[in-house]
Amino acid sequence: MESTSGERSENIHEDQGIPKVILPADFNKCSRTDLVVLISRMLVSLIAINENSATKKSDDQITLTRYHSKIPPNISIFNYFIRLTKFSSLEHCVLMTSLYYIDLLQTVYPDFTLNSLTAHRFLLTATTVATKGLCDSFSTNAHYAKVGGVRCHELNILENDFLKRVNYRIIPRDHNITLCSIEQKQKKFVIDKNALGSLDLDSYSYVNRPKSGYNVLDKYYRRIVQLVGSFNASPDKSRKVDYVLPPNIDIVSESGSQTTQLKGSSSPNSHSSQKRYSEAKDAHIYNKRSKPD
């Protein structure tokens, strides 16, 4: 995959011989290969943590989901992600959104856990949904299924299951995860504003924050560089390289966000009477743009 960054610089650690790459501040200017490396490191780290925790549970405490494989696929997370990115031409925003979707899905579907049995199907589903929701052009599910190594019918089921669980809130926005959690508890697609308490969603509307989606992904980008930018920070050793951001770039601001789950979210648009929530439009756009196989 090509590098899209003119800002990427590299030097060698004299003590360990590990290349040090200074990434661009903007994830859209980062090499897609570097993004895949970072996200793969994050995923492998999460898998290691979750599977270590799962060993303490009995079999009857583990719930199988549609994302489970019978056995772990014989392709690494990194190589699988590279395959999806290369043959489906995944864009930067799609790569980052696949990571964001982990927090989103786990919020409304506690039975889902990212592990060696679920990671591959989740990645395939996440990148398929994100591509359709965020990109102007995309392929059919038949293509994505072939690249991902599953049957098209299975991918259709996974995609539909994901969309229903997150109420079609597939665009990363401030307070999106919070709203999904409230909706899941209330069993409603549109939340009564009185149930939101002190959460002021008007200030988070698309009109007031047109770059909300970018800002959420930017937080995830900076956070994963902080957490797994170092080669020694993750069990994934696919690429021997250390990643850092430019020295004048802040990592993740702790105000208004959380470090483990950057609970961004979405908001109602009080300036438009026909759109109570911008996510209702997201669902309409997704259905309109999705093509049958």
Swiss-Prot record:
Keyword Amino-acid biosynthesis in record: no
Function: Cyclin partner of the cyclin-dependent kinase (CDK) PHO85. Negatively regulates the expression of phosphate-starvation-responsive genes under phosphate-rich conditions. The PHO80-PHO85 cyclin-CDK holoenzyme phosphorylates and inactivates the transcription factor PHO4, by preventing its association with the transcription factor PHO2 and the nuclear import receptor PSE1, and by promoting association with the nuclear export receptor MSN5, excluding PHO4 from the nucleus.
Stated name of the protein: PHO85 cyclin PHO80
Disulfide bond annotation, renumbered to this chain: none
Outcome reported for the amino acid change (mutating L163S): Temperature-sensitive allele
Keyword set, alphabetical order: Cyclin, Cytoplasm, Nucleus, Phosphoprotein
One of the protein's GO biological processes: intracellular monoatomic cation homeostasis
Lineage: Eukaryota, Fungi, Dikarya, Ascomycota, Saccharomycotina
Biased composition (Polar residues): 254-272
Processing and modification events after translation: Phosphorylation of Ser-267 by PHO85 is required to form an active cyclin-kinase complex and for function.
Region listing for Disordered, in residue ranges: 254-293
GO cellular component: cyclin-dependent protein kinase holoenzyme complex; cytoplasm; nucleus; Pho85-Pho80 CDK-cyclin complex
Biased composition (Basic and acidic residues): 276-293
Complex and partners: Forms a cyclin-CDK complex with PHO85. PHO80-PHO85 forms a stable complex with its inhibitor PHO81 under both high- and low-phosphate conditions, but PHO81 only inhibits the kinase upon phosphate starvation. Interacts with transcription factor PHO4.
